[in-house]
Amino acid sequence: MAMSDRLLAAWYHGHPALTLLRPLEWLYRRVVAGKRQRFLDGEGEIYQSPVPVIVVGNITVGGTGKTPMILWLIEHCRRHGLRVGVVSRGYGAKPAQLPWRVQADQTADIAGDEPLLIVQRTGVPLMIDPDRSAAVRALLDSEPLDLILSDDGMQHYRLARDLELVLIDAARGLGNRRCLPAGPLREPAERLQSVDGVLFNGALEDRDGGFAFRLKPSALVNLRSGERRPLDHFPPGQAVHAVAGIGNPQRFFNTLEALDWRPVPHAFADHAEYSVQALSFTPSLPVVMTEKDAVKCRAFAADDWWYLTVDAVPSPAFVAWFDTQLMRLLPDRLLP
């Protein structure tokens, strides 16, 4: 088990050795608190976009279903007639310059896996730059937009935001509720009291502290041909090599089991780089991976490699609440 996996297990399931990291946690909390307080006090350069900015992020380390939720937000806003753009850090991307406009025909090593997935799925204008303020400026210079979604960036306080949405894995919760490196929190749990909306991935119903949403598998797509097949393409009990290089691989493996397949799990680091050698498995079985992994594997995919598309399905209460927020932010632009 890699060091990162051991840390995740300790954060979410407990380990006495974590007490040794509490002095470092104290320092981390001081830095984070100071950074946020400077933002609240209006110190430093804070960029206020001329169009509303909605930040969609986490306060925990590990996957929470953020990308599927961003895809849902894009399509939902478009149904209201809004012109939507997205900015992202572009983790792992190595573009020729920054800011960088992501195009669907680029590769993940240039554009980053999550930004490339978002553009290939939706065609949305998307700019990457660790400086999200610079990304917003570049995006607005490139075309007229009504609204910008920031893919993560909760802690990027130089970009003013009009709405903050935080996603939490309902099964994992906040782990031991301690901050890095003694726990999985990027910011103290109290930060949830200041955000606008909290979404719990996998919750069965809305909670007092937030809304429920789930990830619904929708289709299998062949990496080589692009052919879409229904979920019953594989018969019940089909064994598959399951590949997941995401923040919470076990959730993907559980999804395949819920589809009545028998996954042979192959967990990789989040944002992992792949090769033919790394994905040469025995015995010979179909390979099923996440859509995020697929954008990095198409160039060398075999005929029986597939990715599973999943769609975020938020609760009706969240949809109604979010529409109210859109009406508040864009009263003159929103279509019924």
Curated annotation (Swiss-Prot):
Keywords: ATP-binding, Kinase, Lipid A biosynthesis, Lipid biosynthesis, Lipid metabolism, Nucleotide-binding, Transferase
GO-annotated molecular function: ATP binding; tetraacyldisaccharide 4'-kinase activity
Associated pathway: Glycolipid biosynthesis; lipid IV(A) biosynthesis; lipid IV(A) from (3R)-3-hydroxytetradecanoyl-[acyl-carrier-protein] and UDP-N-acetyl-alpha-D-glucosamine: step 6/6
UniProt cross-references to InterPro entries, sorted A to Z: LpxK, P-loop_NTPase
Positions of ATP binding: T60, V61, G62, G63, T64, G65, K66, T67
EC number: 2.7.1.130
One of the record's GO cellular component terms: plasma membrane
Transmembrane segments annotated in the record for this chain: none
Record's catalysed reaction(s): a lipid A disaccharide + ATP = a lipid IVA + ADP + H(+)
GO terms, biological process: lipid A biosynthetic process; lipopolysaccharide core region biosynthetic process
Stored NCBIfam families: lpxK
Function: Transfers the gamma-phosphate of ATP to the 4'-position of a tetraacyldisaccharide 1-phosphate intermediate (termed DS-1-P) to form tetraacyldisaccharide 1,4'-bis-phosphate (lipid IVA).
Family: Belongs to the LpxK family.
Protein name: Tetraacyldisaccharide 4'-kinase
Lineage summary: Bacteria, Pseudomonadati, Pseudomonadota, Gammaproteobacteria, Pseudomonadales
Primary gene name: lpxK
